[in-house]
Amino acid sequence: MYFVIVLFGLFSNTAYGQITVTQFNAGWNSANDVPWIMGLKDCKSLGYSDIAKNSEEATKYKIAVVPTIIIFKDGEEAVRFQADLSFKMVATKEEVQEAIDELLRSDF
């Protein structure tokens, strides 16, 4: 039984260790922050980057509109969700979670 638990632990860390999610926004657009991002599941980490304070991040990830949510798999961009012209995120929590789940399923 102990072996099964250890094996499951190793397997789950491998699967979950690949996905990170970052929200890119700017302080002047804080009214349109995406609060539900911290409730996403099966991610190694969830982050926030204020591109008004860290313009290098905006350049590095080619952020054209805020907020933008990027899902990274193994350190590489896998999926991007961007706000509409009114600077509001159009993607839902369910859509972002489904993208995460699909990336995890693609490993099997």
Descriptions of predicted regions:
Residues 1-7:
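Sec-dependent signal peptide recognition
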Residues 35-38, 63, 84-85:
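Short, glycine/charged-enriched secondary-structure capping and boundary segments
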